[in-house]
Every structure is written in C-alpha cells, then in structure tokens.
C-alpha cells in the first residue's frame, strides 16, 4: 500500500486537466524533452471519467505545472481563469491517502 495524493474530480475538472496536460505534452515533444510522465498522466485521466484521482509526486507536480501554464495563457489573452484557478487550488491542496491499487 502506497501513499498518493487524492483529488476528487468531476467531469469539468477532468477536461481542464486533460487540456492543460495536452498542451504541455505538445511543448515537450517539440523541444525533444522526455514525455513519459505527461503521456502516462494524460492516458490515466482519459481512461477515468469522474471520481477519484490518485497522483504520485511526479504526476502532482506535472499537473500543477500544466494548469499554471494554461492559466498564464488565459491571463495573457485577457480571458477569465476562474475555473482553472479552482482546479489548480484543489490539486495543490490535495492530501495524501493510502492507495492499494487495482488488486484490493
């Protein structure tokens, strides 16, 4: 049993996170950086519709980075970032919980 960060996600939060991660994935791919963590996290989020999201430390930091970049883009273009802010704060405030995996 490992300890991972737990976030309760709904459909809108899920779509915002996937959108932000796709942008980071594209940027990393263009720059020739390793994209394994980002790709795995996008696939993990795409498989799950709603509900519980368990994040490792690398996935947590990648999610915060991606949402922050999306927020900066919105602010630069003069758009509101209220929805992104709420998702970002929820992920940043996430707490550790025991995670047993699929084979409970």
Summary of predicted features, one role per range:
Residues 1-104:
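Positively charged, low-complexity terminal tracts
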């Amino acid at each position: 049993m490992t300890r991972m960060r737990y976030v309760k996600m709904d459909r809108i939060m899920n779509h915002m996170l996937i959108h932000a991660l796709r942008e980071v994935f594209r940027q990393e791919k263009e720059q020739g950086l390793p994209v394994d963590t980002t790709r795995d996290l996008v696939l993990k989020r795409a498989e799950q519709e709603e509900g519980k999201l368990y994040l490792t430390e690398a996935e947590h930091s990648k999610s915060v980075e991606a949402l922050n970049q999306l927020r900066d883009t919105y602010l630069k273009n003069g758009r509101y970032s209220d929805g992104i802010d709420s998702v970002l704060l929820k992920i940043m405030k996430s707490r550790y919980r025991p995670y047993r995996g699929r084979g409970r």
